[in-house]
């Protein structure tokens, strides 16, 4: 798993934490074919990420999933036996919190992609709602993706896997990852007993609570699904104004500090 190398002065983070970029769900089961209509599969530079369709022309994912030669697939369940309504797109434009595409702060691992042409809703394709309010601590939320389901070797599934995890206090993640900046623009989510988690290949995918996208898979412990090591998710609610401004055409909009 790729080690975090964002803040040079946070050496302990560099040594201990792993980003889930080019990063299946650990401890999950095959998703119901109808429950992930907004889930997007992305390939770039030989890597894999996930994303979320939020309207017919826009996909929300992680900034660290940016790369060249990106292909975006919608309506996918089985990679080997594609659905008849699978649609493929490429980015028309990409937007980041910072114009230099950096996400040095842990609250800026977010990217908004405008597709080259609109997507048509179908049996296996539909957008997911943006959050109406932030999730409360203790909420049960859904993770999903085509990432590896093994913590010891990269074993990727043919179909996406899903699992339920819980929202935790930010302090839980601060205790798990010493040196984590005191910011409230991320969500701390997972199973403290371990065994269920996002992992390599799930980056950029959604954390779904009550039918809304509340988080974007960002990073976590060096081994996925470890005890007392929840995952770190970009908090979508805190970026709503930026998202809506970009979609409305205000490309100079900036993310919250």
From Swiss-Prot:
Gene3D superfamilies: Trypsin-like serine proteases. Its main location: secreted. It is found in: Secreted. It holds the Pfam family Trypsin. GO terms for molecular function: serine-type endopeptidase activity; toxin activity. Expressed by the venom gland. Glycans are attached at residue 100. Its EC number is 3.4.21.-. Monomer. One of its GO terms (cellular component) is secretory granule. Residues 25-248 form the Peptidase S1 domain. Residues 19-24 form a propeptide. Snake venom serine protease that may act in the hemostasis system of the prey. PANTHER family: KALLIKREIN-1, KALLIKREIN-RELATED. SMART domains: Tryp_SPc. Keywords: Disulfide bond, Glycoprotein, Hemostasis impairing toxin, Hydrolase, Plasminogen activation, Protease, Secreted, Serine protease, Signal, Toxin, Zymogen. One of its GO terms (biological process) is proteolysis. PROSITE patterns: TRYPSIN_DOM (PS50240), TRYPSIN_HIS (PS00134), TRYPSIN_SER (PS00135). Belongs to the peptidase S1 family. Snake venom subfamily. Residues 1-18 form the signal peptide. The keyword Methyltransferase does not apply. This is Snake venom serine protease Haly-2. Disulfide bonds join 31-162, 49-65, 97-255, 141-209, 173-188, 199-224. InterPro entries: Peptidase_S1_PA, Peptidase_S1_PA_chymotrypsin, Peptidase_S1A, Trypsin_dom, TRYPSIN_HIS, TRYPSIN_SER. It comes from Gloydius brevicauda (Korean slamosa snake).
């Amino acid at each position: 798993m790729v080690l975090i190398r964002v803040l040079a002065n946070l050496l302990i983070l560099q040594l201990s934490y792993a980003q889930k970029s080019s990063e299946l769900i650990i401890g999950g089961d095959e998703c119901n074919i109808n429950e992930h209509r907004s889930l997007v599969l992305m390939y770039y530079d030989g890597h894999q990420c996930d994303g979320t369709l939020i309207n017919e022309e826009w996909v929300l994912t992680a900034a660290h999933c940016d790369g060249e030669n990106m292909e975006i697939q919608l309506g996918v369940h089985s990679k080997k036996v594609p659905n008849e309504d699978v649609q493929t797109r490429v980015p028309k434009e990409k937007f980041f919190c910072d114009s230099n595409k950096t996400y040095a702060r842990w609250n800026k691992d977010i990217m908004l992609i405008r597709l080259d042409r609109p997507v048509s809703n179908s049996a296996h394709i539909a957008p997911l709602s943006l959050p109406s309010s932030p999730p409360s601590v203790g909420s049960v939320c859904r993770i999903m993706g085509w990432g590896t389901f093994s913590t010891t070797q990269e074993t990727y599934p043919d179909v996406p896997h899903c699992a339920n995890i819980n929202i935790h206090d930010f302090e839980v993640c601060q205790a798990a990852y010493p040196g984590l900046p005191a910011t409230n623009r991320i969500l701390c989510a997972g199973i403290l007993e371990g065994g269920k988690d996002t992992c390599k290949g799930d980056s950029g995918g959604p954390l779904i609570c009550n039918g809304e996208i509340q988080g974007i898979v960002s990073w976590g412990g060096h081994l996925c699904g470890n005890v007392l090591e929840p995952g770190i998710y970009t908090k979508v609610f805190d970026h709503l104004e930026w998202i809506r401004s970009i979609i409305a055409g205000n490309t100079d909009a900036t993310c919250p500090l």
